[in-house]
Structures are given as C-alpha cells and as structure tokens.
A protein has these predicted regions:
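A conserved hydrophobic secondary-structure block that centers on an alpha-helix together
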Residues: 118-188
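Internal hydrophobic scaffold segments of catalytic domains
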Residues: 55-57, 61-81, 161-193
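Soluble extramembrane regions of membrane proteins in the secretory/endomembrane system
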Residues: 20, 24, 39, 54, ...
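Noncatalytic luminal/extracellular "stalk/propeptide" segments of secretory-pathway proteins
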Residues: 23-138, 203-206
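N-terminal capping segment at the start of a domain
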Residues: 1-35
C-alpha cells in the first residue's frame, strides 16, 4: 500500500545524519567558486557513488561578478558609514570563518559611485511607486531604499531605474524577518541584526540564469 511504502521510506531517513550533512556543507562560505563549494561537490559525489549511483561532476564556466570594494555612507545631516560586515555569532563557530565570505552585495548590481538624496519606497514595487506619485514624491535623480519582500529582489533596482532613480539600496527589515517575528538566531529562527542577504539582481526575464549560457 502507498502508506506502507511511505512509512518504510520515512524510516530509512535519519534526521541526525541529515543534520550532520547540512552542518558540514554550511561549515564554510560555499558560494559558486568557493573552495568549500568544491569540497561539498566532491563529498556529495563520493556519497552518491557509495550508494551505487552513476554520478559525476560537470564543470561549467559562468559569469559571476564580485566587487573589489563596497561602501555605503550617509553624508548629511549627520555622517554615518555602514560597516557592511556580519559579526560573529556567539555559539556558532562557523560564523567567524569569513576568509572566503562574499561582501555585502548582490550579483549584477550596478558599478559606480553615486551620491544623491535618499527616498524610502517601502518594498519598491509598482504599487509603492503609484502611492509615491499620489503623494507628489518624485524619485528621479534620487537613491531609493527598499525593503526586501513582496517581490523578487531583481525587480527593485529595475523599477527604480525605470522611475529615474540613480541608485537602489535593498535592506532586510526586522519587521519582516527579524526580532518581531522570532528571537534572533541562534536563540530563534529570525535573522541576526547584522545578517545580510545576498543574491542576484540580474534581469531574469532577459537572462533566466547564467547570462553566458545559451
């Protein structure tokens, strides 16, 4: 019976073993091109072969831009310089292993040096710009700051550009994923105060994946 098959399948899964695999894979920064990412691939390959699977590692050259320098400063009415770093978390030894860690950025972000007034655009989605227009707020020539959420991150800088903005900052609002939701990690599941999201803002409708891959 399907239920019996499902029960036998569930019994073959060890949550302790899976937890060990996840901790091993996440023990070091493991983004594309990172040494630990390669180690994870080789470890997974060895595991698959041990299970009797016909497996191999395929190698692809992909376009993966990383910045040489990232900075964010407020210049008026008072000066503030963002640290753009994630502090080690007490109780989590892996959080201090930052040798191969990516900086606080999103892949395919714009390159340049921009200084302009700042405009808050909520989530930076179409309805938010309509609301700003009704209030007489123009983002042309401004830097917009938008919350993560309510839409894919890549839409936020694109919509900002479409409305004439010269820059876009995306941040994680604690109201959405922080202490208002749960206790911060490691006590709870919420994002730590210094946690930074990373990802891509490539134009997915135009490039649904690696821009160099047919």
């Amino acid at each position: 019976a399907p239920a019996d098959i499902e029960s036998r399948f569930d019994a073959s899964i060890s949550s302790k073993e899976m937890d060990g695999w996840m901790k091993k894979m996440a023990a070091e920064p493991n983004h594309v091109g990172a040494p630990h990412n390669r180690a994870n691939a080789e470890d997974t390959l060895a595991r698959f072969k041990a299970w009797g699977w016909d497996a191999k590692i395929e190698t692809f050259d992909v376009l993966y831009p990383t910045p040489t320098r990232v900075s964010l400063d407020l210049v008026t009415p008072r000066r503030f310089k963002a640290t753009l770093t994630e502090r080690p978390i007490p109780g989590d030894a892996t959080s201090s292993r930052t040798r191969d860690q990516l900086p606080a950025y999103v892949a395919f972000q714009g390159d340049g040096d921009v200084t302009a007034p700042l405009v808050y655009v909520n989530y930076g989605m179409p309805d938010d710009y309509k609301a700003l227009e009704r209030m007489g707020v123009d983002v042309k020539g401004k830097i917009v700051i938008a919350r993560y959420g309510q839409g894919w991150r890549g839409l936020k800088p694109k919509l900002a550009q479409d409305h004439g903005a010269v820059g876009c900052i995306i941040y994680s609002d604690p109201r959405d994923d922080g202490f208002s939701v749960d206790d911060a990690y490691p006590k709870g599941a919420a994002r730590p105060a210094q946690g930074v999201q990373r990802g891509s803002v490539a134009d997915m409708p135009l490039y649904p994946g690696d821009p160099l891959t047919p």
